[in-house]
């Protein structure tokens, strides 16, 4: 009788252990939105059509600041996107982006939309990462998050040929 109880106990333990997820817990859409809407800073390496570059990005409240650090010819070009309006700044030149549709603005707008957290997300797991996909009217985007930290590591917008690798992601205050 004791042997049967022991085997039953061992079987239950093995079943419970088998139910655990390898590589950390999955994140819900609500948790991902909380991460995306949090104040943060990071480095973004991007490919947009034939343009490759790098930018520093800061999000504070509803204001999103993007400053290009590469390519060299665009170093210092900045975008400030917010609820009161958006601007492109280069040196002493400031352009309000009310009705302008320039190539670089689309990249900035994608980052702003992704980190606004307003789109419904479908969450899946693939190859040790968490994928959060949003379907918008004219395109869809996927945010890839680390299972280990829950922080975003990439954004992909296939219809617009935009790929963004995120590094040095730092939430304001150090942690979420």
Q: Where in this protein do the model-derived segments appear?
A:
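Flexible, processing/modification-adjacent segments and terminal tails
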Residues: 30-36, 40-44, 88-139
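A short, compositionally biased
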Residues: 39-40, 61, 81-84, 126-128, ...
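Hydrophobic/aromatic beta-strand elements that line small-molecule binding cavities or substrate pockets
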Residues: 53-58, 79, 141-145, 166
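An acidic-aromatic
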Residues: 57-114, 160-163
